[in-house]
Amino acid sequence: MSDKKVIGILGGMGPLATADLFQKITLHTAASCDQDHPRVCIDSNTNISDRTAALLHGGADPVPEMVKSAQRLESIGADLLIMPCNTAHNFYDAVASSVSIPVLHMIAITRDALKSRGVKCAGLLATDGTVQTGIYQRTFEGSGVELLTPDNTEDQSAVMDIIYNGVKAGDLTHDATAFRAACEHLLARGAEVLILGCTELPPAFDIYHLDYPNIDPTLELALAAVRAAGCKTK
């Protein structure tokens, strides 16, 4: 397929989330040979500073390195960009304005997927940076999908713990008991599904054998990118 577009992955936020996105692009492309897959360029830029630390705690600005990666990917031939990091979408405008190619918006794609499935209430599992800045709430405004977030500090701390001390730390045997409770509390309050609103959470669900109804924004982004590249999904 000579008319395929090249997907650029602005990655490193974190590395496992980047690998998870690429795997989902590959697994969900309807392909009978290598040539049916989209061409993908990946910059797993681990020099990008922590997004939550920047947003809430005065940490280093991640935008300069994000922009470098975006422009690097465009310069080597990417026709569209995707960012496997929910919190990074707080800096979406800065990245999108730095390049002349489209940047797909993972949170908007997730919103549209929930609407198409008729979901009326979803529970958001995400970093403090994503929850407190309201990026999901703003994107979902007027969508008809109610968003629930953890309503106590213990549950939100459990989400941060599984992300940072579990997945990011590479602890494959991390205790997920408190995180399970946070998930169950959201479902008990009326959430029909849980939004895995940090790209470390889909791997967490696999690593720690979690089984709750959910929507995976990484998967939704992968599907959208494959279609935008001119390939078929499965």
What positions do the PLM features span?
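Non-catalytic structural scaffold of enzyme domains
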Residues: 1-234
